[in-house]
Design a protein with these regions (language model features):
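Extended, low-polarity transmembrane helix blocks
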Residues: 1-33, 44-50, 54-57, 61-120
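Surface-exposed loop/turn positions within long extracellular repeat scaffolds
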Residues: 38-40
């Protein structure tokens, strides 16, 4: 069993990356294509959508390019900090656990890049 898991280890960062990228593509695209001048906490929705979609695309490109992983994760981290501070903080822990989890995963990708499985 350990042998199989050791063989799969170099690829373990791909599934969470795909799930994270898909989530932000699905949530960001409608904001990006909305032509109404809607704002969330004073920020135009298309700007939020640009960060979400751009971050997601960069995370996917990041499967083969380390720099894209780091930049994509940082873009999504900015969105998550804003979501926590401006929208979800009023709900306490019950309203922030998912946002904090996404932020933690993004910070891991931002700091480790594609060296997640290399022990560096």
């Amino acid at each position: 069993m350990n042998q199989l898991l050791n063989k799969l280890s170099p690829y373990s960062h791909i599934l969470p990356r795909i799930v994270l990228a898909t989530t932000f593509l699905v949530h960001g695209y409608p904001k990006l294509t909305n032509t109404d001048p809607i704002t969330a906490m004073g920020i135009p929705m298309y700007v939020i959508g640009l960060f979400e979609v751009g971050g997601a695309i960069l995370l996917l490109i990041g499967i083969i390019k380390d720099w894209a992983t780091r930049i994509g994760a940082l873009l999504i981290s900015v969105i998550m900090v804003g979501a926590i501070a401006l929208v979800h903080i009023k709900d306490g822990w019950q309203g922030n656990e998912w946002q904090l989890l996404i932020l933690a995963v993004c910070l891991m990708y931002a700091t480790k890049g594609n060296s997640i499985n290399k022990g560096s």
